[in-house]
Amino acid sequence: MKVNYDLKMEEILKEISESGKKKRLLIHSCCGPCSSSVLEYLKEFFEIDIYFYNPNITYDYEYVARMEEQKEMLKKLDYDMNVIEGVYNPKEDFFEKIKGLENEKEGGQRCYSCYDIRIGETAKKAKEEAYDFFSTVLSISPMKNVNYINEIGEKYSKEYDIPFLFADFKKKNRYLRSVQISKELDMYRQEYCGCVFSKIEKEQRDREKAEREKQEGEVKND
């Protein structure tokens, strides 16, 4: 049966609103643009800290660019939120853990493992620091598997005994809102998820698109 994760989130937010007191939330973020509309929406219900743990980002220059953009976004929006940086060790925390899945297509088992790595570490950190909830912004992307994300969140909620904020953040135009905020703030918005495999796939799609457009142009000129 298909689960409405947006509805599950709204039920949790309703309870928090009725309690009259904000809860503490540690939310995993992959980048500033993806977190923008999520934070805008959730700040009315939570005291939020951002956990920037992304060992899947292969290149250190890309990692630094996304981290700095995350911090800069909070400054521009004047959000009273802390960015907690996790350990950045792609070799041990990503490549070692996805061995054997290198040739998987984007959206498959390798991505599941990547979500698992990051959400699991977020749950662990949230438990250690006594947050009321943990979550991730990953479901803001139309390209991400919302079932994978929430199933993993539920798994670690049970393991660490801390509530997971279920979500399908792209719903109710929040993805479009994230794009709008990114443009308004002139934010750096990356063109691939983060790992070298997603970068290679993106470059391949671009080449195929360019070739199609070239062929279509030649047909029109005949």
Where are these regions (language model features)?
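Nucleotide-activated chemistry modules centered on ATP-dependent adenylation/adenylyltransferase
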Residues: 1-222
